[in-house]
Curated annotation (Swiss-Prot):
Subunit structure: Homodimer.
Xref: HAMAP family: PyrC_classII
Name of the protein: Dihydroorotase
Binding site for substrate: 15-17, 41, 136, 219, 251, 263
Residue numbers binding Zn(2+) 1: 13, 15, 99, 247
Catalysis: reaction(s): (S)-dihydroorotate + H2O = N-carbamoyl-L-aspartate + H(+)
Keyword Phosphoprotein set for record: no
Pfam families attached to this UniProt entry: Amidohydro_1 (PF01979)
The encoding gene: pyrC
PTM annotation (N6-carboxylysine): residues: 99
CDD domains per UniProt: DHOase
A GO molecular function held by the record: zinc ion binding
Length: 343
């Protein structure tokens, strides 16, 4: 039986939601992740230090006994985020980054940034105090094809931010294109990217060919196979610039299986197992530990986790649904087998 032991991984991009759903999302992600960067796009969003810290307390209250799971908090940038707010957030010791959501780009992004120039004072403060800048890299112009929005964002917006703030550490989150891989690879050491398990395992054919499969619908949207292969190559390359970020984003079953379904795929139930499948598919299991457990903390200047987990190649069947507060979520690979499990 094949087994691999790796340093305990972290998730550098997750949506835990709030309220009644929190106990279920925290239960799933805390099983073997040491830490997670928690997205701030709540309703209302975590736009200030106080809101982010009270959210931290709600998450910690749901961490199961015996788990050392630690949430790492993020400030939601708006047109009005002040340099003083950035300094307050950094001083808290619990808020490690601030997030750019272009207004309207994704779930609960309506409070996001309408013009990049509006956050330049905040970015200057972040560069000064060493707070990371997390980016949802898509333009929101309705005239731009949804499959091109990441590429256009990189060309028109991100390249300028990188040039204007050379000392700012930037994470281009949940990259989905060869364009993003190439940009991050060629950029300075201050630019990195997270990659999801579902973008490594699937492409738009899985979502659209032979019937619409709404549980694969996420933002940024799944791209063509050539982009998927570029992501796999980047993740398995050994480059320190790429690391694990699930972007696990639960929605109730009826919100996904609808005439206008929500964007987001749920993978927290089996995150590292799905990544193991992806790395095995390109004969790169030896590169999984660095991607999952080393590159993220190194980029964030945080210590690596001290303990380990063991994965065993032993197929198991994923339930059709998992509880999500007072409703249910359909996970990726629902009703099907996953090849790996945590021992």
């Amino acid at each position: 039986m094949t087994t691999i032991t790796i340093t305990r991984p972290d998730d550098w991009h997750i949506h835990l939601r709030d309220g009644a759903q929190l106990k279920d999302t925290v239960r799933d992600i805390s099983r073997y992740m040491g830490r997670a960067i928690v997205m701030p796009n709540l309703v209302p969003p975590a736009i200030d230090t106080e809101t982010a810290l009270t959210y931290y307390d709600r998450i910690k209250a749901q961490v199961p006994a015996g788990s050392q799971f630690e949430p790492l908090m993020v400030l939601y940038l708006t047109d009005k985020t002040s340099p003083d707010e950035i300094r307050r957030a950094k001083a808290s010791g619990k808020i490690v980054a601030a997030k750019l959501y272009p207004a309207g780009a994704t779930t609960n992004s309506d409070s996001g940034v309408t013009d990049l120039k509006n956050i330049y004072p905040a970015l200057e403060a972040m560069q000064e105090v060493g707070m990371l800048f997390l980016v949802h890299g898509e333009v929101t112009d309705s005239s731009i094809d949804i499959f091109d929005r990441e590429r256009v964002f990189i060309e028109n917006i991100l390249s300028k931010i990188v040039a204007d703030f050379p000392e700012l550490k930037i994470v281009l989150e949940h990259i989905t294109t060869k364009d993003a891989v190439d940009f991050v690879t060629q950029a300075s050491d201050n630019v990195a990217a997270t990659i999801t398990a579902h973008h490594l395992l699937y492409n738009r054919n899985h979502m659209l060919a032979g019937g619409i499969r709404p549980h694969f619908y996420c933002l940024p949207i799944l791209k063509r196979n050539t982009h998927q292969q570029a992501l796999l190559a980047a993740a398995a390359s050994g480059s320190k610039k790429f690391f694990l970020g699930t972007d696990s984003a639960p929605h109730a079953k009826d919100k996904k299986e609808a005439a206008c379904g929500c964007a987001g795929s749920y993978t927290a139930h089996a995150a590292i197992e799905l990544y193991a499948e992806a790395f095995e598919s390109v004969n790169a299991l030896d590169k999984l530990e660095a991607f999952a457990s080393f590159n993220g903390p190194d980029f964030y200047n945080l210590p690596r986790n001290a303990d380990t987990i063991t994965l065993v190649k032993k197929p198991w069947n994923v339930p059709a649904t998992y509880p999500l507060g007072d409703t249910n979520v359909v996970p990726i690979r629902a009703g099907e087998a996953i090849d790996w499990q945590v021992e």
